[in-house]
Each structure stands twice: as C-alpha cells, then as structure tokens.
Amino acid sequence: MLLNRTDDRTDELALIRTEPISMQWNNELRKTAGLHPNCRLLKELLSLDPYTRTVVYPFLIKGWSSIRIADRFRVSQMTIQTLLEIGREQLKRKLAGFR
C-alpha cells in the first residue's frame, strides 16, 4: 500500500476518494475494460487500490499531467507523484509476467 503515510497524506487521500470524479473515472475504466476484455493494461489498472487507480487512470488514459491531477483533487503534487510511482511499480511488476 502507501509507504510512510502521514496524517496530511491520509487527509489528502480521503479527498481523492470522496471526489465525484473519482467514481466517474472508475466507472469509465470498468466500462472500457469490458469493451476491451483482452487488454491487460486495463485489467491491471482495475486491480490497483482505489487511490492509486484514481490517480493513474487520468495520467495514463486521459493524458493528464501530475500537476493537473493535483489541482483537480486539491492535494499536493507530492501525493500525486507518490501514487503514480506506486502505480508504475505495481503495473510494471504485474505486466512483466505477461510477455
């Protein structure tokens, strides 16, 4: 999960989770994954924890910058960067086994 959570970081994660756009993006991802059942990336995105998935999805699929994501959720860019790094490592590890 997330390393070295501080109270501030935990509060920021709560902001990410409660944003309506978070639910909308998760629904979009599920729908898109259903339309493309053979796409490993979409399946693995769905397997990420909700906080990480909510940050990685707009970064990878929508092409948003980390600054734009941080601004959208009103959290620090460091929180977004941490979640993106966690997501990158998890996806890299999961997708490496499917070569």
Segments predicted by a language model, with ranges:
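DNA-recognition helix of helix-turn-helix
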Residues: 73-98
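Short helix/strand-capping connector loops at secondary-structure junctions
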Residues: 65-74
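Amphipathic alpha-helical segment used for protein-protein interaction
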Residues: 22-52
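Hydrophobic positions on the alpha-helical face of helix-turn-helix-like DNA-binding modules
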Residues: 56, 69-70, 80
